[in-house]
Amino acid sequence: MRLLVRPEEEELERVLRRSEMDVTEVLPDVERIFEDVVERGDEALLEYTERFDGVKLEAEDLRVSEDDFEVARELVDERTVEALEEAAHRIEEFHRKTLPRVDRITFDVEGTECGLTLRPIPRVGCYVPGGRAAYPSTALMTVIPARVAGCREVVVCTPPADNDVRASPEVLVAVEIAGADAVYRVGGAQAIAALAAGTETVLRVDKIVGPGNVYVTAAKLLAYSRGLTDVDMPAGPSEVFVIADDSANPDWLARDLIAQAEHDPHAAAVLATDSEEIARAVKERVEELLDAGIEREEIVLKALDRNGWIVVLDSLEECVRLANRYAPEHLQLCVENPEELLQDVENAGAVFVGHLTAVPFGDYATGPNHVLPTGGFARARGALGTWDFVKIIPIQRLREGDVERLAPIVEELAEREGLPNHAEAVRARRS
């Protein structure tokens, strides 16, 4: 990790420029895959599954059967099943408590009846990635809020695997616990194309959520740009930004940075502090842990070499300002008085308050969602939640008195915008 002590703005810009996910490089390949799936459906899915995943399936294998779920249960350790069930309970409880509960509200706007109604998105597709590792926790984090929101059908796509159930057994158990209606053994851009356009087997959905690699992200953006389906957010490499003072534990901080770095060679791990002593202690501890040997060491080393920074600034207020510019996926406040800093936090996917609140607790068990904006998108949105699975529909009702009051406004503005028939539609209703 690189240490910067009271850096100049040019050096801070280097910290802010973490790895970005450039979909333009893969977009031509994704477009070809997309068109092929739209044109040939299941046949294309089976070919891409064999080519990219090395798993040969028949059409009837695309959808996971009830027997497969039973076998998956037998393959997964009971302690893992119990952990998934306990995590699911907490995730569901959190999302039920954050569910917008208003079915319809009406109110008066200058004498006119207006209002809102909330409706669940009918069909949702959840992408649960494979690749470097299987992520059953992502199945919980995507399926549960959709189900809590009242979506009529919730389906899952996850990459196939070469085993007895031809998918991650842990993911299948998690999906069953979460309550999805169907699971398909298909991953990558082809999975997104199938969910967006539908095939003989895969149900076409109204929205796609869940993280994935650059091909998955490009496919989601392509599906959205073509008006086929809505999507949640682009997903880039994972990142953590830690703010610490001299009350922090250097060993804990070092392990927190390493934990984030193990996600991906392009992951980012940044520590900002007002204590040079803490900064040097954390850097030394990271090096000690790496020298002693850790699991996933190659990934961690690449990530910390590319996007690992320890920054010493003059005050914690400056650290918060830098964090707001960074807009991290995960923000940890490892300081003596975290509430004082929390009120100034503007941009973060999720905030972890206090020395005890390590990011992995939020990844798995506290309850809030771990599908979060990366790459600076926390400037504009926060975590996935039940609000992502409902539509807010405005309602308005005019009565005769409203027509006379509003018609002059509408007629004037419609004429100015060159839409005379808008004005005529209103004039026809005047007494």
UniProtKB/Swiss-Prot annotation:
<dbReference type="InterPro" id="IPR016161">
    <property type="entry name" value="Ald_DH/histidinol_DH"/>
</dbReference>
<feature type="binding site">
    <location>
        <position position="422"/>
    </location>
    <ligand>
        <name>Zn(2+)</name>
    </ligand>
</feature>
<dbReference type="GO" id="GO:0008270">
    <property type="term" value="F:zinc ion binding"/>
</dbReference>
<keyword id="KW-0862">Zinc</keyword>
<feature type="binding site">
    <location>
        <position position="263"/>
    </location>
    <ligand>
        <name>substrate</name>
    </ligand>
</feature>
<keyword id="KW-0560">Oxidoreductase</keyword>
<dbReference type="GO" id="GO:0051287">
    <property type="term" value="F:NAD binding"/>
</dbReference>
<comment type="similarity">
    <text>Belongs to the histidinol dehydrogenase family.</text>
</comment>
<feature type="binding site">
    <location>
        <position position="260"/>
    </location>
    <ligand>
        <name>Zn(2+)</name>
    </ligand>
</feature>
<dbReference type="InterPro" id="IPR022695">
    <property type="entry name" value="Histidinol_DH_monofunct"/>
</dbReference>
<feature type="active site" description="Proton acceptor">
    <location>
        <position position="329"/>
    </location>
</feature>
<feature type="binding site">
    <location>
        <position position="422"/>
    </location>
    <ligand>
        <name>substrate</name>
    </ligand>
</feature>
<feature type="binding site">
    <location>
        <position position="260"/>
    </location>
    <ligand>
        <name>substrate</name>
    </ligand>
</feature>
<feature type="active site" description="Proton acceptor">
    <location>
        <position position="330"/>
    </location>
</feature>
<feature type="binding site">
    <location>
        <position position="213"/>
    </location>
    <ligand>
        <name>NAD(+)</name>
    </ligand>
</feature>
<feature type="binding site">
    <location>
        <position position="190"/>
    </location>
    <ligand>
        <name>NAD(+)</name>
    </ligand>
</feature>
<feature type="binding site">
    <location>
        <position position="330"/>
    </location>
    <ligand>
        <name>substrate</name>
    </ligand>
</feature>
<dbReference type="GO" id="GO:0005737">
    <property type="term" value="C:cytoplasm"/>
</dbReference>
<feature type="binding site">
    <location>
        <position position="238"/>
    </location>
    <ligand>
        <name>substrate</name>
    </ligand>
</feature>
<keyword id="KW-0368">Histidine biosynthesis</keyword>
<feature type="binding site">
    <location>
        <position position="263"/>
    </location>
    <ligand>
        <name>Zn(2+)</name>
    </ligand>
</feature>
<keyword id="KW-0479">Metal-binding</keyword>
<dbReference type="InterPro" id="IPR012131">
    <property type="entry name" value="Hstdl_DH"/>
</dbReference>
<comment type="pathway">
    <text>Amino-acid biosynthesis; L-histidine biosynthesis; L-histidine from 5-phospho-alpha-D-ribose 1-diphosphate: step 9/9.</text>
</comment>
<feature type="binding site">
    <location>
        <position position="127"/>
    </location>
    <ligand>
        <name>NAD(+)</name>
    </ligand>
</feature>
<feature type="binding site">
    <location>
        <position position="363"/>
    </location>
    <ligand>
        <name>substrate</name>
    </ligand>
</feature>
<comment type="function">
    <text>Catalyzes the sequential NAD-dependent oxidations of L-histidinol to L-histidinaldehyde and then to L-histidine.</text>
</comment>
<keyword id="KW-0520">NAD</keyword>
<feature type="binding site">
    <location>
        <position position="417"/>
    </location>
    <ligand>
        <name>substrate</name>
    </ligand>
</feature>
<feature type="binding site">
    <location>
        <position position="363"/>
    </location>
    <ligand>
        <name>Zn(2+)</name>
    </ligand>
</feature>
<dbReference type="GO" id="GO:0004399">
    <property type="term" value="F:histidinol dehydrogenase activity"/>
</dbReference>
<dbReference type="InterPro" id="IPR001692">
    <property type="entry name" value="Histidinol_DH_CS"/>
</dbReference>
<keyword id="KW-0028">Amino-acid biosynthesis</keyword>
<protein>
    <recommendedName>
        <fullName>Histidinol dehydrogenase</fullName>
        <ecNumber>1.1.1.23</ecNumber>
    </recommendedName>
</protein>
<dbReference type="GO" id="GO:0000105">
    <property type="term" value="P:L-histidine biosynthetic process"/>
</dbReference>
<dbReference type="Pfam" id="PF00815">
    <property type="entry name" value="Histidinol_dh"/>
</dbReference>
